[in-house]
Amino acid sequence: GNRLIAQQVTLSQSATIQSLSYYVATTGGQLRLGIYNNSGSAPGALMAQTAAFTPVAGWNTQAVTTPLSLSPGTYWLVFLPQNNTLAGRLGQSGIGRHYSYTFGAMPSTYSTSYTGDTFHFSFYATLSLP
């Protein structure tokens, strides 16, 4: 909990983000999901986020508060758990970033003082094509 956790993803064509889905293995507290643009090799500016919600075990899909058109490129799917009890399904590949952040609305820009790591969670965006 109290960590803003990001994983890098690539969008191959223009699309509008509708929702974000995250797999919860162990429930606990609330969760917020978001997407940031890319800045160098790290998350940059917040593009969209969900409202805070109480997740259930398994897949949790939440609409973003404002659907957003995205161009092809690199983005970061980001999640913010309220506490350390909540656990996702973790893999040991991929590019990840994380840092301490108090639960609430996601910051407008991701901190440049992050820890880099190798991981990915079961986490995806649902998109609509133009």
Protein language model regions, located:
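Generic detector of ordered secondary-structure context
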Residues: 1, 12-13, 25, 69
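Short beta-strands within extracellular/lumenal beta-sheet-rich domains
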Residues: 1-11, 59-62
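A carbohydrate-recognition surface predominantly in extracellular/luminal proteins
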Residues: 7, 20-22
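Extended extracellular/luminal ectodomain segments enriched in beta-structured repeat modules
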Residues: 11-19, 28
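Aromatic- and Gly/Pro-enriched, solvent-exposed loop/edge beta-strand patches characteristic
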Residues: 24-115
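Cross-kingdom TIR/SEFIR domain
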Residues: 117-119
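Low-complexity, Pro/Thr/Ser/Gly/Ala-rich linker/spacer regions in secreted
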Residues: 127-130
